[in-house]
Amino acid sequence: MGDRVILHSDINCCYASIEHLHHPELAGKPLAVGGDPEARHGIVLTADYIAKKYGVKTGMALWQAKQICPDITFVSPRMDLYLRFSRMAHEIYAEYTDRQEPYGIDECWLDVTGSSSLKGDGLLIAQEISRRMKSELGITVSVGVSFNKIFAKLGSDYKKPDAITTMYKSEFKQKAWSLPVADLLYVGKSTNRKLALFGIKTIGDLARADEDVLNSHLGKMGGILWSFANGYDDSPVKLENAHAPIKSVGNSTTTPKDLVCDEDVKIVLYILAESVAARLRENGFQCRVVEISVRDNELFSFTRQKKIDHATNITGEIAAYAYQIFKENYNWSKPIRSVGVRGADLVTDNYWEQIDLFSSVEKREKQMKMDSAVDEIRRRFGFYSIQRGLMYRDRILSAVNAKEEHTVHPHGYFG
């Protein structure tokens, strides 16, 4: 059996590139998306390449960016606009494969192994996607072409902007092993520091290291990273819209900025709970288990779940349980980058159970009616036609339409 053909497409400076399309008067001028430009607070979510040449970086405070790049223009984020472009990009990808796995709004893996007889080899498909993104959407992408997901991602990071890089079996050692080990997916700052203690500075150093030593100091992650560095990654690209029996309903997102307090997490959990609850109702299910997943900015992740008192598909109940689980299990040792909510142990809507006499049946019925009304309003007028008051506390965090954008992140190695 031949090698797989995996692409990783990354929209260059996604938010900033899209804003440039809508602000032609800023052509050739530095631009950054983030925070509240009028209030002069917040952080940079993304900067264009002109601003980056001045040293402007993602996560930098707006006032700092202004200091090092006085001519920079700040624009407020418009997540609905960026999501629309993301959908259009996925429509292009879908013409080459139904195996596409998003990694945030701007990145996506594509398994085009079965497309070569009709569309050409991986390099040819990458070139065609790159051309179409420019001509049809007006934006550029960097694409990695490889035999697995890890090196395809490394390939898209290898050269930017508007570039295509191959990482074939015959060449990955030559191209990848000299790169800093921090360039490898899932090597965060903390892991990078630990590896440095063993003299591991490059991907090649990691590949040549003793796997048992890595396992003893890094646990399961040591062996995983050693495998990645040596090209051993057989994780599949998920099949889009695969029709499998529904065992759980969940959603996760990498947030536009790091979450640093309970209030930040509460906003995102409610957005995700709205998505999960709405999908449960659409499919005629209720859940008896609520689960959350959390990944910090060092890419350490954990999941926790709770068996709840009664089956539910009520948004407020799922959100409240999710927030309770979070409060009981997270100590804020690090900021948070990614959050997920899942409803499991599903039963059908007509499932009967005895309700606790002390619970407010009337209150639950009112909540169910309210959820149904919200569902109908959003069906008719769009997701943003009605939002919870909580969402207005942070315009950036509340901008993602989690119901419509099921952003899935690779987590099979961290189960």
Predicted ranges, named:
Residues M1-S227, V237-E240, A278, R364-G415:
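Gly/Gly-Pro- and Ser/Thr-rich, intrinsically disordered tail segments characteristic of DNA damage-repair
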Residues C14, P37-R40, N297-F300, L346-D349:
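Short, charged/polar surface micro-motifs in flexible loops or helix N-caps
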Residues H8, D183, T191-I336:
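DNA-contacting surface of Y-family translesion DNA polymerases
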